[in-house]
Amino acid sequence: MDAVKMLHALIPPHALDAVRRAFERHAVLGMTIVEVRGPGTDGHRSVHRGAVVTDGLVPCLRIESIVHDDVVDRVVDEVTAAVRAEGRLWVVPLDLVTRVRTGERGADAV
């Protein structure tokens, strides 16, 4: 069974197209994208009882995708180069991936 890893990326929304192109170049076709708020230098500003309040969080996207081990370093390098902004990437090894519909396991399930 070929090794696969879970790639997590926290990126600004404007970087999504560049990240998708980097994924496609390495045949990383499936991903989950969620709108979240994360730490940033600007933060979210609101007015509460006449005072401006900044919570230190900015809108961003969290992307999760399963990536084959042999391309994960190249994908991380390309995403890092493409985003060129505030963001985070982290990679987690996966012990087992199963495609529920077919029962395929490991890299075949990706």
Residue ranges of each PLM-predicted region?
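Positively charged, small/polar-rich N-terminal and surface patches that mediate targeting and assembly
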Residues: 1-110
